[in-house]
């Protein structure tokens, strides 16, 4: 790129000096000299480059970069992540329910993401409800899976817009760049298959608010436009301009690095890919005003000198230097040969260094060769000193050159806001930090016995069941004891047989119940 400051194309433009501002103008072609009267002298209009005969000025509107515009153009957007929450329940024989939550991801659709974003921005409760975990269902002795899809919106997510090709740059994009946003495709892929990036506004061009409308004067000849006078009063040539789009707006990049959008019928080529434009900042505007003031001052000095010449009817070499054209283009050259005032048509070019026109002692280079002098006199106040050196009056005046150098130092190229292409997420932790899914972590929940009763009912039922079980145990133990006692008595009687003896009431020994019975019968 050859960044040349935008402003002094008149003073300094048309220079093929690799972007440097000229410090002087000198004819590269000089017509034949002819004598004139002092009343034919005139001061040039240094605010307009009268090149190629484009002297017709007409008002028009054009578009340029805003003052104070910063190269980084921020585009607000949001990320949309598709999340599937799965609830798995199992109910065992006694009614214990085990619930396990799992989370997976899916790639969302742009339309669904836009709807979810609108819900979130509007405070619609449907967005919050969509993030809740699914209500798990369950059935006895069965495993039940319940899934729910959610879209997690994270905003803002800011990307940098490249005004040259409308691409977006951010660390969330693959390789740090997204070029896919068009009318039909309004999203960007990210480093994660399940997350997409979308701009907050459907119209991406609204984020590129870097232009302003200005008024100026078009310099033309017929249908051809040679240049224009900008809003600040400086002339800018279209020579060497090329077509360049910024944020999709077609415009012209001038030789000094300025970008303007204007209607012209001129055939212009497209700029090379490496051509950038210069920023339009407050400092350059201030210096432009200083240069304009200096040009106006130079014109006033020229008019004062011209008035003095006409009034006194005398002219000097020093006064002729005020009549030199300060900008490139067609003009006049004046000199005095043998006490005769002479005039010649000339085409001025820019000079970057004094060595270009004074390569050696006594040599004034014009048109590629040393220009001859007449008795030590050249033209436009340039003379040959007594020591043989070429003397140029403007070599002693550096104020305008200081302004020009300040302007040159204030040129700031509008660079591509490229993000670091090597900053791509590689670690899992960085990935999770980027996603920031605002959902519960994967966890497992085991419930108590679920019989469909409230908590107090479950406690009453449990207490009653425990009491009934205790009473049942006591009853069974009692019954078991009563059954065991008669069985043991019968076994003992069967074991003695007839050897049982008893004692009667009279005190006699009776060997058996039968004997006792028969004796009783006898006694009776």
From Swiss-Prot:
<comment type="function">
    <text>Attaches the virus to host cellular receptor, inducing endocytosis of the virion by using different host proteins including TFRC, GRM2 and ITGB1. In the endosome, the acidic pH induces conformational changes in the glycoprotein trimer, which trigger fusion between virus and cell membrane. There is convincing in vitro evidence that the muscular form of the nicotinic acetylcholine receptor (nAChR), the neuronal cell adhesion molecule (NCAM), and the p75 neurotrophin receptor (p75NTR) bind glycoprotein and thereby facilitate rabies virus entry into cells.</text>
</comment>
<feature type="glycosylation site" description="N-linked (GlcNAc...) asparagine; by host">
    <location>
        <position position="338"/>
    </location>
</feature>
<comment type="similarity">
    <text>Belongs to the lyssavirus glycoprotein family.</text>
</comment>
<keyword id="KW-0564">Palmitate</keyword>
<keyword id="KW-1015">Disulfide bond</keyword>
<feature type="disulfide bond">
    <location>
        <begin position="363"/>
        <end position="370"/>
    </location>
</feature>
<keyword id="KW-0812">Transmembrane</keyword>
<keyword id="KW-0732">Signal</keyword>
<keyword id="KW-0325">Glycoprotein</keyword>
<dbReference type="GO" id="GO:0016020">
    <property type="term" value="C:membrane"/>
</dbReference>
<feature type="topological domain" description="Virion surface">
    <location>
        <begin position="20"/>
        <end position="459"/>
    </location>
</feature>
<keyword id="KW-0472">Membrane</keyword>
<keyword id="KW-0261">Viral envelope protein</keyword>
<feature type="disulfide bond">
    <location>
        <begin position="80"/>
        <end position="113"/>
    </location>
</feature>
<dbReference type="Pfam" id="PF24834">
    <property type="entry name" value="PH_Rhabdo_glycop"/>
</dbReference>
<feature type="disulfide bond">
    <location>
        <begin position="43"/>
        <end position="302"/>
    </location>
</feature>
<dbReference type="Pfam" id="PF00974">
    <property type="entry name" value="Rhabdo_glycop_FD"/>
</dbReference>
<dbReference type="Pfam" id="PF24833">
    <property type="entry name" value="Rhabdo_glycop_CD"/>
</dbReference>
<feature type="glycosylation site" description="N-linked (GlcNAc...) asparagine; by host">
    <location>
        <position position="266"/>
    </location>
</feature>
<protein>
    <recommendedName>
        <fullName>Glycoprotein</fullName>
    </recommendedName>
</protein>
<feature type="disulfide bond">
    <location>
        <begin position="208"/>
        <end position="247"/>
    </location>
</feature>
<dbReference type="GO" id="GO:0098670">
    <property type="term" value="P:entry receptor-mediated virion attachment to host cell"/>
</dbReference>
<keyword id="KW-0449">Lipoprotein</keyword>
<feature type="topological domain" description="Intravirion">
    <location>
        <begin position="481"/>
        <end position="524"/>
    </location>
</feature>
<dbReference type="InterPro" id="IPR001903">
    <property type="entry name" value="Rhabdo_glycop_FD"/>
</dbReference>
<comment type="subunit">
    <text>Homotrimer. Interacts with matrix protein. Interacts with host TRFC. Interacts with host BST2; this interaction inhibits viral budding by tethering new virions to the cell surface. Interacts with ITGB1. Interacts with host GRM2.</text>
</comment>
<feature type="disulfide bond">
    <location>
        <begin position="242"/>
        <end position="271"/>
    </location>
</feature>
<dbReference type="GO" id="GO:0036338">
    <property type="term" value="C:viral membrane"/>
</dbReference>
<dbReference type="GO" id="GO:0055036">
    <property type="term" value="C:virion membrane"/>
</dbReference>
<dbReference type="GO" id="GO:0019031">
    <property type="term" value="C:viral envelope"/>
</dbReference>
<feature type="signal peptide">
    <location>
        <begin position="1"/>
        <end position="19"/>
    </location>
</feature>
<feature type="transmembrane region" description="Helical">
    <location>
        <begin position="460"/>
        <end position="480"/>
    </location>
</feature>
<feature type="glycosylation site" description="N-linked (GlcNAc...) asparagine; by host">
    <location>
        <position position="56"/>
    </location>
</feature>
<dbReference type="InterPro" id="IPR055448">
    <property type="entry name" value="PH_Rhabdo_glycop"/>
</dbReference>
<dbReference type="GO" id="GO:0039654">
    <property type="term" value="P:fusion of virus membrane with host endosome membrane"/>
</dbReference>
<feature type="lipid moiety-binding region" description="S-palmitoyl cysteine; by host">
    <location>
        <position position="480"/>
    </location>
</feature>
<dbReference type="InterPro" id="IPR055447">
    <property type="entry name" value="Rhabdo_glycop_CD"/>
</dbReference>
<feature type="disulfide bond">
    <location>
        <begin position="54"/>
        <end position="226"/>
    </location>
</feature>
<keyword id="KW-1133">Transmembrane helix</keyword>
<feature type="disulfide bond">
    <location>
        <begin position="178"/>
        <end position="188"/>
    </location>
</feature>
<keyword id="KW-0946">Virion</keyword>
């Amino acid at each position: 790129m050859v960044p040349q400051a935008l402003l002094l194309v008149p003073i300094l433009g048309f220079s093929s000096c690799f972007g440097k501002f000229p410090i002087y103008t000198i004819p590269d072609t000089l017509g034949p000299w002819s004598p004139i009267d002092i009343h034919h002298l005139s001061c040039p209009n240094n605010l307009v480059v009268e090149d190629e005969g484009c002297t017709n000025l007409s008002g028009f509107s054009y578009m340029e970069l805003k003052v104070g515009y910063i190269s980084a153009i921020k585009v607000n957007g949001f990320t949309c992540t598709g999340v599937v929450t799965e609830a798995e329940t199992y109910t065992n024989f006694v009614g214990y329910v085990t619930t396990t939550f799992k989370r997976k991801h899916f790639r969302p659709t742009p339309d669904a993401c836009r709807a979810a974003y609108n819900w979130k921005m509007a405070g619609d409760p449907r967005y919050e409800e969509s993030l809740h975990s699914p209500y798990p269902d369950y059935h006895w002795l069965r495993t039940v899976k319940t899934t729910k899809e959610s879209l997690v919106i994270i905003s803002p997510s800011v990307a940098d817009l490249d005004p040259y090709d409308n691409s977006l740059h951010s660390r969330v994009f693959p390789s740090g760049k997204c070029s896919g946003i068009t009318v039909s495709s309004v999203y960007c892929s990210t480093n994660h298959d399940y997350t997409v990036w979308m701009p907050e506004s459907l119209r991406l061009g609204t984020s590129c608010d870097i232009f302003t409308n200005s008024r100026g004067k078009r310099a033309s000849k017929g249908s051809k436009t040679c240049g224009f006078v900008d809003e600040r009063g400086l002339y800018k040539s279209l020579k060497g301009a090329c077509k360049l789009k910024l944020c999709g707006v077609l415009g012209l990049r001038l030789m000094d690095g300025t970008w303007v959008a204007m209607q012209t019928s001129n055939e212009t080529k497209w700029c090379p890919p490496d051509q950038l434009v210069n920023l339009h900042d407050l400092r350059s505007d201030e210096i432009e005003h200083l240069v304009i003031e200096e040009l106006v001052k130079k014109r006033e000095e020229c008019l004062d000198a011209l008035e003095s010449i006409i009034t006194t009817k005398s002219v000097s070499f020093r006064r002729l230097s005020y009549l030199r054209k300060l900008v490139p283009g067609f003009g006049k050259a004046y000199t005095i040969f043998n006490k005769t005032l002479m005039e010649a048509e000339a085409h001025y070019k820019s000079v970057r260094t004094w060595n270009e026109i004074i390569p050696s002692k006594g040599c004034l280079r014009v048109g590629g060769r040393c220009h001859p002098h007449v008795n030590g006199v050249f033209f436009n106040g340039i003379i040959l000193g007594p020591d043989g050196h070429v003397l140029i009056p403007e070599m002693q005046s550096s104020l305008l050159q200081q302004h020009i150098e300040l302007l040159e130092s204030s040129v700031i190229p509008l660079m591509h806001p490229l993000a670091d292409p090597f900053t791509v997420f590689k670690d899992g932790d960085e990935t999770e930090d980027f996603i920031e899914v605002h959902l519960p972590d994967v966890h497992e929940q085991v419930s108590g016995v679920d019989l469909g009763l409230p908590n107090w009912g479950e406690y009453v039922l449990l207490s009653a069941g425990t009491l009934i079980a205790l009473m049942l145990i006591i009853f069974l133990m009692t019954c078991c004891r009563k059954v065991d006692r008669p069985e043991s008595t019968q076994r003992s009687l069967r074991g003695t047989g007839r050897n049982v003896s008893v004692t009667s009431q009279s005190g006699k020994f009776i060997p058996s119940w039968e004997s006792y019975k028969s004796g009783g019968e006898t006694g009776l």
